[in-house]
Amino acid sequence: MILQAHLHSLCLLMLYLATGYGQEGKFSGPLKPMTFSIYEGQEPSQIIFQFKANPPAVTFELTGETDNIFVIEREGLLYYNRALDRETRSTHNLQVAALDANGIIVEGPVPITIKVKDINDNRPTFLQSKYEGSVRQNSRPGKPFLYVNATDLDDPATPNGQLYYQIVIQLPMINNVMYFQINNKTGAISLTREGSQELNPAKNPSYNLVISVKDMGGQSENSFSDTTSVDIIVTENIWKAPKPVEMVENSTDPHPIKITQVRWNDPGAQYSLVDKEKLPRFPFSIDQEGDIYVTQPLDREEKDAYVFYAVAKDEYGKPLSYPLEIHVKVKDINDNPPTCPSPVTVFEVQENERLGNSIGTLTAHDRDEENTANSFLNYRIVEQTPKLPMDGLFLIQTYAGMLQLAKQSLKKQDTPQYNLTIEVSDKDFKTLCFVQINVIDINDQIPIFEKSDYGNLTLAEDTNIGSTILTIQATDADEPFTGSSKILYHIIKGDSEGRLGVDTDPHTNTGYVIIKKPLDFETAAVSNIVFKAENPEPLVFGVKYNASSFAKFTLIVTDVNEAPQFSQHVFQAKVSEDVAIGTKVGNVTAKDPEGLDISYSLRGDTRGWLKIDHVTGEIFSVAPLDREAGSPYRVQVVATEVGGSSLSSVSEFHLILMDVNDNPPRLAKDYTGLFFCHPLSAPGSLIFEATDDDQHLFRGPHFTFSLGSGSLQNDWEVSKINGTHARLSTRHTEFEEREYVVLIRINDGGRPPLEGIVSLPVTFCSCVEGSCFRPAGHQTGIPTVGMAVGILLTTLLVIGIILAVVFIRIKKDKGKDNVESAQASEVKPLRS
């Protein structure tokens, strides 16, 4: 046995020398902490590294997670003798120490980390051989109603462990249309748009799906796979808009009054109403059972119909489905009397008016609903004043209100005016209206133009609209200021486009010819206009309009070089924001009145997204479009004459970008500062919110959440709360007092699905009164206690020195005074 071991060591040594491991560098070196990566499943007896011994070390010792796989020879050769398995242990933590001849550690031990790299040696496996679920008809497309889950023991951070789900077959398959779809990454099953519209439990109450899962992200021919079966029951969706409601106006019943109801499919929904029209007064409410009420009497004359939305939300305020449209029609009651068109309605009648001729029509109004009995009016003459030469000179059509002459006995000199009182009634109300009928002279004179030819007039085609270009005049010898003498001017020839009009002065009968529409040299350079003057009252029998009532006029329009004219003031186009570069996104058209060619250009393309064909006006994309950066995207289009004076005109082009799923999810806000108090007494959790910049309309985002790395699964778990919120929870309480960065993978379930990996920093720290306590360090510029004591002692020392100097100086001054006193007494002369 000993001989066999020595032989094995000798073979390794020879292999080691033959392959160059003995050279200092990549494969050999001094004893120090090191990390090695080795693929699992490789042949054993592979040399990993040669450690060099420094005297007095003569041999090496290996400890740690060797699993009887890793061995170190006395000479320092580290190798493994069996194939590694990442799924058994992904990391081996070893320690190597150098020993002297007596077996005493003289160097180390140092950590040696062996990381086992993954190979694709495990097939994915569904957690269940069969799944069952249910979905309601008309459920929102893309909203998951069931998840299938598979596991793969390979490393999820590599393609080996990345799973790809797909639907193999749908049974039954109706018209070759897929009603179901699956998120390739998460296994979330939802309805397609066709499934949302066409699923009907009355026709097909159940479906079966065969789902496959592949590893290698489904991108390799050598992928391992597994399949499972999914049985789906289609249930009726009771979240449906109710039938339109009719509510009688001005109801005197106690309010609120229940008028209809909506119901979500499951209990616990929170209901609300949304005023679609943003009315200042919204007279409806809904309770938490889904019953809808009118809260006050309605007035049909104020508003005859209401349209609003009923919304169902979950406990977090997120919509459960699309809102339902509620229609309420206000039913009319007869609560309005007829009204007269004016206090007094005036008509004129010629004294020789023929029997039965129409004098005029009295049109009363009723605010109740049109074309119903409530607004159906009857007319009746109740009084004629004066009754000369007899009563009953006039009659009125009962339902039309048209007044007619009943008897041919009118004479202006005897009775120039009649007053009628007319009763207008609906089925419940009556109103009196007053009509004044003026008897006027017979219309036996025609209008006569003062001249029959108003000559020629030359105008530029850009003459302003509203300009008066000509004054015409006709006279009438009938009774002044009556319908027999009033003159109306009409253009009967030469202006088929209606570019001109004539206004009449009622006091002078003067006609003013004005420009109503732009003149155009290109279509009407010369117009031969014919005017006709006539009265609003009919002429008496035997009198007809003749040439005296007609006049002519020639209008000559001169050319003006006009700018090109766009066919529209604003052009709009709608495209998906992910269209390929070079795609035609719209076009504009303009014409030059003079027929010149036009060159198109763009102005205000601040993002450089578009180009325009200068000849055809077709607009193309030249860069990636982004709805989130700007939609609608507004630019100006310039049309310029080619040649001539190069006049130009400008129109707007609005490009509406339809959203695609091109923004990965992210955290809704900065979550710096999340913490748990250390040590944990029980597992804890934190709630966070995700968002993205794509458009979600009513349904809002529906994210799914998972941990961003398989290495986090022992410490953390993440669970979905709703479409935007999730809970991060600890799996145990044994955390160190430090900051952890937890990676979260967020999938938006869109088409195509996008994922974002975000970081949540979570700190485990000591707490004081529920807050994270971090000891304050020394701050630059603030003295420490030692510094303060030093400053104080220095100050006292300086004061002491100053006092000592002062005292010494005082003492010296005293000594000097004493000497001077002594000397003075010694020289004083003696007296005898």
UniProtKB/Swiss-Prot annotation:
GO CC term (a single one): plasma membrane
Keywords: Calcium, Cell adhesion, Cell membrane, Glycoprotein, Membrane, Metal-binding, Repeat, Signal, Transmembrane, Transmembrane helix, Transport
GO MF annotations, alphabetized: beta-catenin binding; cadherin binding; calcium ion binding; integrin binding; proton-dependent oligopeptide secondary active transmembrane transporter activity
Tissue: Expressed in the gastrointestinal tract and pancreatic duct. Not detected in kidney, lung, liver, brain, adrenal gland and skin.
PROSITE patterns on file: CADHERIN_1 (PS00232), CADHERIN_2 (PS50268)
Matching PANTHER family: CADHERIN-17, CADHERIN-23
Protein name as catalogued: Cadherin-17
UniProt organism field: Homo sapiens
